[in-house]
């Protein structure tokens, strides 16, 4: 690793404004082309069981937002892809790397079902079995757009891209309900934004910044440092449409939010790298997505541009932890 590399996270960065060239932020185009499709904003809700389910996936696809369906109801995936295709919507699913997942890819091909997007979703994505899965998908479903992760180094990005991945997901344990850094001593928690920058410099294909985003301004910062798309969990948790279990405490409504490697997800205490928290229920997800878009439009206006490209060129300063601690919410 480069010892001269700048280490920072979202709360350590402030971008420096340029002259505004739009009359209104409504003129700003926040759309992003990711693979074969274009989406309203460079944001995707995390593919976690407390964040996304089939009705929400349909709603997101109908409204031109990117989504990735989680992989924790494997028996539903074939029908889900078929249903989305019948609706004329994009089909975007997740797979793991166990033997039956390789069989599932072959079954999709046998049924002549090609999802638009397939995300290989494991905690430590820099692994031979992930490379094997990328090549397996590309052999049986050559037209699927393959997202592979998660990784945290340029070497991993290059190797997964060379294996055939169309995009890589960067982030090892920076999420709000991920405790990888505490359980293992490894990860990008505390320097996730620097890791995104480090990986993006090596990437030839799109990067998804996954985890550690606590505020809408962090989306703009992710774009500045090379991400094409941002995966977000905690900001989407606790909405009326998200599928986490509701809990009433002293008359207040909360929703469960837990990590994909938590014991609540796994149903076992073995190899746990996630935890469960309760978040206040906070209204409709459409309102949050609209607010994200408006804040991103404002960010682009501060960058002196009309679209997301302008964010990639702005100057910035590192102000170590002087704004606030990103976990205060």
UniProtKB/Swiss-Prot annotation:
Q: Which Gene3D superfamilies match?
A: Aldolase class I
Can you tell which superkingdom this protein's organism belongs to? Bacteria
Task: Give yes or no: UniProt keyword Oxidoreductase.
Answer: yes
Entry GO terms, CC: cytosol; GMP reductase complex
Q: Which UniProt keywords apply?
A: NADP, Oxidoreductase
- Keyword Oxidoreductase belongs to the record: yes
Q: What class of enzyme is it?
A: oxidoreductase
Q: Name one GO biological process term.
A: purine nucleotide metabolic process
Database matches in PROSITE patterns:
IMP_DH_GMP_RED (PS00487)
Database matches in Pfam families: IMPDH (PF00478)
Looking up InterPro entries in the UniProt record yields: Aldolase_TIM, GMP_reductase, GuaC_type_2, IMP_DH/GMP_Rdtase_CS, IMP_DH_GMPRt
Active site (catalytic residues): 178 (thioimidate intermediate)
SUPFAM superfamilies per record: Inosine monophosphate dehydrogenase (IMPDH)
Biological role: Catalyzes the irreversible NADPH-dependent deamination of GMP to IMP. It functions in the conversion of nucleobase, nucleoside and nucleotide derivatives of G to A nucleotides, and in maintaining the intracellular balance of A and G nucleotides.
- What is this protein's record name? GMP reductase
Q: Quote the gene name from the UniProt entry.
A: guaC
């Amino acid at each position: 690793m480069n010892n001269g590399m700048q280490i920072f996270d979202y709360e350590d960065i402030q971008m420096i404004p340029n002259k505004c060239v739009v009359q209104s932020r409504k003129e700003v185009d926040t759309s992003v082309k990711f693979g074969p499709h274009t989406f309203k904003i460079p944001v995707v809700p995390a593919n976690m069981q407390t964040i996304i389910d089939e009705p929400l996936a349909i709603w997101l696809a109908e409204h031109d937002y990117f989504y990735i369906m989680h992989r924790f109801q494997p028996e539903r995936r074939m029908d889900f892809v078929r249903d989305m295709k019948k609706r004329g919507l994009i089909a975007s699913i997740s797979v793991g790397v166990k033997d039956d997942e390789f069989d599932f890819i072959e079954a999709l091909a046998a049924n002549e079902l090609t999802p638009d997007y397939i995300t290989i979703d494991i905690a430590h994505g820099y692994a031979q079995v992930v490379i094997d899965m990328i090549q397996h998908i590309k052999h049986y479903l050559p037209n699927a757009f393959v997202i592979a992760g998660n990784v945290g180094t340029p070497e991993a990005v290059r190797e997964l891209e060379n294996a055939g991945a169309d995009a890589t997901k960067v982030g090892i344990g920076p999420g709000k309900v991920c405790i990888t850094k505490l359980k293992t001593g490894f990860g990008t928690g505390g320097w996730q934004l620097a890791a995104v920058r480090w990986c993006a410099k090596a990437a030839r294909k799109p990067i998804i910044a996954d985890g550690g985003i606590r505020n809408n301004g962090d989306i703009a910062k992710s774009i500045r440092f090379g991400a094409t798309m941002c995966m977000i969990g905690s900001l989407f948790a606790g909405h009326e449409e998200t599928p986490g279990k509701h809990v009433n405490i002293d008359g207040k409504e909360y929703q469960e939010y837990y990590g994909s490697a938590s014991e609540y997800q796994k149903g076992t205490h073995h190899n746990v790298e996630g935890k469960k928290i309760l978040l206040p229920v906070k209204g409709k997800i459409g309102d949050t997505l609209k607010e994200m878009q408006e804040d991103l439009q404002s960010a682009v206006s501060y960058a002196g541009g009309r679209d997301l490209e302008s964010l990639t060129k702005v100057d910035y300063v590192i102000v170590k932890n002087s704004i606030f601690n990103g976990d205060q919410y």
